[in-house]
Regions:
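C-terminal structural segments of small proteins and small subunits
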Residues: 73-97
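Conserved mixed alpha/beta catalytic, RNA-binding, or beta-rich assembly cores of soluble enzyme
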Residues: 1-61, 65, 84-85, 94-98
Length: 99
């Protein structure tokens, strides 16, 4: 799993993606698209395990997760419910914002 934390004046943006998805363009029949090739730098900070991603998910202003593994960590940590998950084709995708 890739994890990148973008530090901003408003808090941390946590971006994480399943490693095998980087470099791919995921699109559904309605034209919804995530370009993990063009925007790879948004996600590719360092390779981490479940524990390090879970720790990063405890301190954020927003979260952007793409892939089965990273989304499963958010579910396990209680940040989201299975019903909150959106899919682009068969790839789970989640955005969380703290207001």
């Amino acid at each position: 799993m890739y994890l990148k934390i973008h530090e901003t004046k408003d808090g941390n943006i946590v971006a994480a993606c399943d490693k095998e998805l980087i470099g791919k363009v995921i699109e559904d029949k309605n034209g919804v698209c995530i370009d993990l090739d063009k925007y790879r730098n948004f996600y590719t900070g360092k390779i981490v395990g479940e524990e390090e991603l879970a720790k990063a998910l405890r301190n954020f202003s927003s979260v952007n997760l793409v892939g089965k593994k990273v989304v499963a960590v958010a579910v396990k940590e209680g940040l989201i419910d299975e019903n909150d998950i959106r899919y682009i084709n068969t790839i789970p995708y989640i955005q969380i914002y703290q207001i």
